[in-house]
Amino acid sequence: MINVMLADDHVLIREGIKQLLEFDGSMKVIAEASDGIECLEKLKNVKPDILLLDINMPNMNGIDVLKELKEKNDPLKVLILTVHSEVEYLVKAVDIGANGYILKDSGSTELKQAINAVIDEGSYI
């Protein structure tokens, strides 16, 4: 089973992604965060296999979360959740060290393929 942490400021998006991931029992969302600060705090106590990270969040955005993780040499794999209008941030996130990205409106098959690719191969770009 793949343990996932989900960081997104929209509760409905988190709930939808959680349902998609947990439907067949192959993945489990073990922690959720609504902003970057909460994400970093929760990561002190949970060890997911992968972090699904939104870019645009209040208090601390996903880019800053990613920077902090990489500065600490954290080996956590990170898959960026994005919308079409965030291309410039997406490029920056990959340059900083994100393992890949996926559009928020992707279906469950594509989302699971992206997560599995990051876990198994180290990237989904």
Question: How would you describe each model-predicted region?
Answer:
Residues 8, 54, 82:
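Active-site residues of response regulator receiver
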Residues 13, 58:
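The feature encodes the CheY-like receiver
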Residues 32-50:
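Acidic, metal-coordinating helix/loop segments flanking the phosphotransfer/catalytic sites
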Residues 35-38, 59-64:
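Acidic catalytic/metal-coordinating carboxylates
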Residues 41, 63-74:
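Short amphipathic alpha-helix used as the core "switch/output" element in two-component signaling
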Residues 49, 55-56:
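The short loop immediately C-terminal to the conserved phospho-acceptor aspartate in CheY-like receiver
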Residues 86, 106-119, 123:
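C-terminal output helix
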